UniProtKB/Swiss-Prot annotation:
Subunit field text: Self-assembles into homopentamers. The capsid has an icosahedral symmetry and consists of 72 capsomers, with each capsomer being a pentamer of L1. Interacts with the minor capsid protein L2; this interaction is necessary for viral genome encapsidation.
Family that this chain belongs to: Belongs to the papillomaviridae L1 protein family.
Functional summary from the UniProt entry: Forms an icosahedral capsid with a T=7 symmetry and about 55 nm diameter. The capsid is composed of 72 pentamers linked to each other by disulfide bonds and associated with L2 proteins. The capsid encapsulates the genomic DNA, but does not bind DNA. Essential for the initial attachment to the host cell.
Keyword Metal-binding included in the entry's annotation: no
Protein name as annotated: Major capsid protein L1
InterPro entries found in the cross-reference section: Capsid_L1_Papillomavir (IPR002210), Capsid_L1_sf_Papillomavir (IPR036973), dsDNA_vir_gr_I_capsid (IPR011222)
GO BP: symbiont entry into host cell; virion attachment to host cell
GO MF term set: structural molecule activity
């Protein structure tokens, strides 16, 4: 039983979205894990809470002697864990109609190619009708 390998075929639906990088969002990400924003090159600086913090992060040659910059590689916090290897290169598709049924697309709000019903237009006739013309008998 030690050599028995199971192979699973999973179907996942990925819904991608765009998140605005507002200060509140960046502060939330920074509080979760400060290493997330370090490689994004956003220029996000944590707001100083007291006067020591205000001068601690200044990187100017006028305020301190320049030290040797260490370019040590950052350690991956998840390197000791083993996750699944999933290859999505051939199967990832944005064409949902081909893979999913209409009922499922309706449930998540994607309605397919049907157009909405036309709106009915009514005119409010508050004035009296114009009198009919008399016809001459020819």
């Amino acid at each position: 039983y030690l050599r028995h390998v199971e192979e699973w075929e999973l179907s996942c639906i990925m819904q991608l979205c765009i998140v605005d990088l507002k200060p509140e969002t960046l502060a939330h990400l920074h509080n979760m894990d400060p290493r997330i924003l370090e490689t994004w090159n956003l220029g996000f600086i944590q707001p100083p809470t007291n006067i020591e913090d205000q001068y601690r992060f200044i990187k100017s040659l006028a305020t301190k002697c320049p030290g040797k910059e260490e370019t040590a590689e950052k350690e991956d916090p998840y390197a000791k864990y083993k996750f699944w290897d999933i290859n999505l290169t051939e199967r990832f598709s944005s064409n949902w109609n081909m893979y999913l049924g209409r009922n499922f697309l309706f449930q998540i709000g994607k309605r397919g190619s049907k157009r909405p019903a036309p709106k009915t237009v009514t005119f409010d006739s508050s004035s009296k009708k114009a009198p009919k013309r008399r016809r001459k008998n020819a």
